[in-house]
């Protein structure tokens, strides 16, 4: 079963890559307000056609991502947005933490911590709060495969009191 999931994820990524240069002409903006109204997550999810934008599964995807944004407070959409200065500062902290680790394992430990640091802060790499077996990026790639057209998270915002 796990092997099948891996194959499906690879197929979704390939499908998304093939559609990457298509124009996005439709989409939706969705907001999720957490109980009490103190936290709001909002997203703009774009697609190629109005037909897909009106689809209930597409709307549910956007709402789920908005809920995730409210809950997890991602700092970056993708790794491309992470500043070098942030990585340098994180690496310095992790190197200090790994000072007592033996030389052979130190580099591997630091790289593992950096990967974890990025996974916690980059929205497209975060495990979805309602289904931690897939990331937000994998969910979007699955939507590309399901709908047969390009789907892209254009913008997200988290507001809190």
Annotate the PLM regions.
Residues 1-161:
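N-terminal assembly/interaction segments in proteins that build large macromolecular machines
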């Amino acid at each position: 079963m796990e092997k099948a999931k891996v194959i499906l994820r690879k197929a979704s990524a390939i499908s998304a890559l093939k559609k990457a240069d298509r124009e996005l002409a439709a989409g939706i903006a969705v907001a999720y307000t957490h109980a009490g109204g103190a936290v709001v997550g909002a997203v703009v999810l774009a697609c190629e056609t109005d037909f897909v934008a009106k689809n209930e599964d597409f709307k549910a995807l956007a709402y789920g991502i908005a809920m995730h944004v409210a809950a997890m407070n991602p700092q970056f959409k993708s790794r491309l947005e992470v500043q070098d200065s942030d990585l340098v500062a994180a690496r310095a902290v992790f190197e200090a933490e790994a000072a007592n680790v033996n030389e052979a394992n130190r580099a591997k430990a630091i790289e593992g911590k950096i990967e974890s640091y990025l996974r916690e802060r980059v929205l497209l790499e975060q495990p979805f709060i309602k289904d931690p077996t897939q990331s937000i990026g994998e969910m979007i790639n699955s939507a590309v495969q399901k709908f047969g057209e390009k789907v892209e998270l254009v913008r997200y915002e988290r507001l809190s009191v």
